[in-house]
């Protein structure tokens, strides 16, 4: 058995099974290597979407940097074998400045770069991340940082936008109307998870504070908003407000829809509310879809 010098890293590697590289016969320079993806012949079908998923990259949501999870895709003609996937991240890097700004205009420019680099007509992106914002306690007005989950979806064909979507997931308080009605005092309440997927008009300018308007529709219609910091006067106000505004899951999604339907820059929306029931072992949920 060969003895290795265990005082060196290389010796320890070989002691644990590493071997020297072989003398290869295939090309080692890029220009000499076969580019299978660029093979051109009849491959029977064109592909609508091909790309990468779960790409984690820094993003900027308003003034905060956070981690974004991306899915990028392009089309592929039937006479091309595949895409050069490394060009996707190269396209992203051209727009990187301490993060990719999560705004539709920035994502549109990324997709236009992707189209050019991939030499394809269609391109799309979905990216999700945490949205952080200032949240003030309702009575003492103490500032802290709240958060919600946002997902942007955008697709283009040529220079035309074919898909423009924003999804927000936020947590709220819901107090049970039935419990309030039948009980001598108090009522059970729980945390509700509200998800709103909006379909944004592709031909109309969107308002500047669109995220805040959607979030306000989600939170203001609940029994109460959630706050990072609550002092005793705040807790009293939150508790009493919830009791004053009882909501079933059915009530909440209908009230949210009534606000969203007034936004002329939306073509439609999907709403789901899921209550993590405090007196059951199961959750309660309701869903609603609307198209103008």
Swiss-Prot record:
Gene: folE2
Metal-binding listed as a keyword: no
Stored InterPro entries: GTP_cyclohydrolase_FolE2 (IPR022838), GTP_cyclohydrolase_FolE2/MptA (IPR003801)
GO biological process, one term: tetrahydrofolate biosynthetic process
GO molecular function terms listed in the Swiss-Prot or TrEMBL record: GTP cyclohydrolase I activity
Lineage: superkingdom: Bacteria
Top EC category: hydrolase
EC numbers: 3.5.4.16
Pathway this chain belongs to: Cofactor biosynthesis; 7,8-dihydroneopterin triphosphate biosynthesis; 7,8-dihydroneopterin triphosphate from GTP: step 1/1
Site (May be catalytically important) location in chain: 176
Family indicated by similarity: Belongs to the GTP cyclohydrolase IV family.
Organism: Staphylococcus aureus (strain JH9)
Transmembrane helix listed as a keyword: no
Reaction it catalyzes: GTP + H2O = 7,8-dihydroneopterin 3'-triphosphate + formate + H(+)
Pfam families linked to this entry: GCHY-1
Cited function: Converts GTP to 7,8-dihydroneopterin triphosphate.
UniProt keyword annotations, A-Z: Hydrolase
Name the UniProt record assigns to this protein: GTP cyclohydrolase FolE2
